């Protein structure tokens, strides 16, 4: 390593839980599916100057492998089957699947290959980019600065929640992808462990080492890929929901609702799906409006909302989480996943708004429409129109 003294990543499990959960489902159902994914910076940061350092880290990732103690720990979890874990034991990152270029200051990254393998790149690669950029931009920032900020926020949170029944408040760390650094995330999570309302982390490495519950089900890419895997676009979301239940019939039952839009999702989320899935996750659009729609939908189907859970994970901080808790906690179970506002909250440090999203499946376009227009991702405007038509959504003049 030259530009960065050593590899940023030290464990194959330093990733979000839903990546392994989805990878196992792909392993069992979609071995032959090929995909392409692309990096996008939603802000105005020109990150192309870091391309060489990122490429260096990508090559270092080929040396990561599942360690024996990690393998043994995974075998003790209820989610995984032996055939998948034995395959994962032999998994290695293939840097040839990753193209990293500096396009006049803009960072371009494209991932291509079997979905089974490409699925693993997104979270650790984003974490690497975030840590590299912050290392160069904010060399004076430290774990202690992050902890000082957290302690102040926790003190404010204690004041804010004084007299409030917090017995139904559950917070998870969702901060791997855009963390300031691996060390900051670990310190934050260790501190949060002291709070009775902290229930787990999406990071499998931290969950193992700190004896926490790993949290996560599926991401947008699960639904996006089914847009081309399913023979009929109009039923692709239902196909994705059904395939997930086939892999996980009675666990990991939180469904992400905004790959198309919440309204389109609820039209597909009939009584069987709503009964079998444990709850729903919010990731775009107005959270109060979304939660009200979810509760109304359960009631319409004759399902007691108190038997279900809503997971909020869109750009949350502690204050927003408490506002939502006050609004909904008497009517439905709740969990809150906070990412960047925990693991990259340091004075004078600007978090990166970066994502890697699926753009093709088996050589054909896929799209994420979402409930926030700025989060729409698709290169093919004709496919966006076809998707909106298939799901009975109004056409819009401009799609990014």
UniProtKB/Swiss-Prot annotation:
A biological process from GO: NAD biosynthetic process via the salvage pathway
Keyword Phosphoprotein: yes
UniProt-listed InterPro entries: N/Namide_PRibTrfase, NAPRTase_N, Nic_PRibTrfase, Nic_PRibTrfase-Fam, Nicotinate_pribotase-like_C
EC number: 6.3.4.21
Top-rank EC class of the record's enzyme: ligase
One GO term describing the cellular component: cytosol
A GO term for molecular function: nicotinate phosphoribosyltransferase activity
Swiss-Prot/TrEMBL keywords: Ligase, Phosphoprotein, Pyridine nucleotide biosynthesis
Phosphohistidine, modified sites: 220
Modification comment: Transiently phosphorylated on a His residue during the reaction cycle. Phosphorylation strongly increases the affinity for substrates and increases the rate of nicotinate D-ribonucleotide production. Dephosphorylation regenerates the low-affinity form of the enzyme, leading to product release.
Catalysed reactions, as listed in the record: nicotinate + 5-phospho-alpha-D-ribose 1-diphosphate + ATP + H2O = nicotinate beta-D-ribonucleotide + ADP + phosphate + diphosphate
This protein's pathway: Cofactor biosynthesis; NAD(+) biosynthesis; nicotinate D-ribonucleotide from nicotinate: step 1/1
HAMAP family given in the database record: NAPRTase
NCBIfam families recorded: NAPRTase, PRK05321.1
Annotated function: Catalyzes the synthesis of beta-nicotinate D-ribonucleotide from nicotinate and 5-phospho-D-ribose 1-phosphate at the expense of ATP.
Family of the protein in this entry: Belongs to the NAPRTase family.
Protein name per the record: Nicotinate phosphoribosyltransferase
Gene name tied to this protein: pncB
